[in-house]
């Protein structure tokens, strides 16, 4: 369980297990953020050491700590209370705990990666002055770097010599566990910084204002994409624009920190008057329009169920984004053609516009 869940309800289940003399091992992740609802701090400013002492106080037979070596932990304080080990010993330690009768607990201490990025931007968290690159001339595409790190910042790189690996520097959280892979292709560069793209001159041609038809009942808009790419912002901007025009609008957003990198759906309903908005969620086959920021999320069953042939108009970016499955399957390839077909089959090819967007990152 996470530290937020532990704080508001998880402790009660552990107490019940102790009371019933159950043999069970709890793994508690202390990532220093309530990730499900936006990355807030914990009520009462609870710390990892507080959790350890509380577990011991309620009668947990053995508590062990696992920590990320890059965390700024007061190890001397922990060592006087429990045994604490580096994270590479996780499997060994949890197997030992599983053999102990009664309730045991493993407290894993590692700050949430998304929260690290936030704090580094604010200068409140250590930012290593180093970046890791993969030399494609040496890489053989074995995928051991992904096995060791389970990291979505490792991307496939298709070459004339086959599939290699590359590191997406914009999503790398500087965990560096990828270098534990049995591979000589890694290059560590100290002092490297990402290139900042210079603001370009935006030339917008004259566009006549469209004739907007009157809204009958509600206009139902669905926006899909990957968390952390501005999908929630698009929904908020459209909702505010409708509000400023005096229209009624209801928007349902997935804004939790845990959505970063995952599928995000925004439901936005617009009406002539606020009183005409009776429900926020767009129901089965009721979407009038869909803006897709990612092909994989848009072609998912959850999204397709909202679309209807000859009713829904779809505009979707068809750039391929790496999926989490690639960390487990080195040969994984997105079924892009099948995803395009799924969308066009649902609403009709005349109602789909697939576009390609380009972005400079480094």
Which residues make up each language-model segment?
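Active-site cofactor/cluster-binding pocket
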Residues: 46-49, 53-54, 60-62, 188-223, ...
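Extended, hydrophobic alpha-helical segments in both membrane/secreted and soluble proteins
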Residues: 1-20, 24-27, 51, 134-151, ...
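Glycine-rich beta-alpha junction loops
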Residues: 31-33, 69-71, 109-114, 318-321, ...
């Amino acid at each position: 369980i996470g530290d937020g869940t532990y704080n508001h309800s998880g402790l009660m289940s552990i107490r019940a297990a102790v009371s019933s003399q159950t043999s069970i091992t709890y793994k508690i992740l202390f990532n220093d953020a309530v990730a499900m609802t936006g990355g807030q701090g914990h009520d009462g400013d609870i710390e990892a050491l507080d959790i350890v002492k509380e577990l011991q106080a309620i009668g947990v037979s053995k508590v062990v700590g696992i920590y990320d070596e890059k965390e700024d932990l007061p190890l001397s304080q922990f060592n006087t209370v429990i045994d604490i080990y580096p994270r590479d010993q996780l499997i060994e330690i949890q197997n030992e705990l599983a053999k102990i009768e009664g309730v045991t607990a493993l407290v894993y201490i590692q700050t949430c990666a998304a929260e690290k990025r936030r704090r580094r931007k604010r200068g409140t968290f250590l930012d290593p002055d180093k970046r890791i690159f993969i030399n494609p001339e040496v890489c053989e595409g074995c995928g051991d770097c992904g096995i060791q790190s389970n990291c979505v910042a490792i991307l496939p790189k298709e070459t004339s010599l086959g599939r290699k690996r590359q590191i997406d520097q914009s999503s790398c959280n500087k965990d560096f566990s990828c270098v534990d892979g049995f591979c000589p292709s890694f290059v560590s560069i100290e002092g490297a910084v990402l290139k900042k793209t210079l603001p370009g001159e935006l030339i917008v041609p004259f566009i006549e204002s469209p004739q907007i038809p009157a809204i009958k009942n509600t206009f139902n808009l669905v926006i899909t994409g990957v968390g952390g790419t501005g999908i929630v912002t698009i929904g908020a901007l459209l909702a505010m624009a409708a509000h400023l025009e005096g229209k009624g609008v209801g928007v349902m957003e997935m804004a939790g920190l845990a959505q970063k990198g995952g599928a995000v759906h925004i439901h936005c309903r617009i009406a002539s008057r606020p009183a005409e908005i009776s429900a926020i969620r767009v129901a089965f086959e009721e979407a009038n329009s869909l803006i897709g920021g990612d092909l994989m999320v848009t072609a998912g069953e959850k999204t397709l169920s909202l679309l209807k042939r000859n009713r829904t108009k779809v505009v979707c970016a068809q750039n391929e984004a790496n999926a989490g499955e690639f960390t487990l399957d080195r040969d994984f390839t997105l079924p892009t053609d099948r995803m395009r077909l799924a969308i066009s089959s649902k609403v009709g090819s005349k109602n789909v516009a697939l576009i390609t967007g380009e972005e400079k990152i480094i």
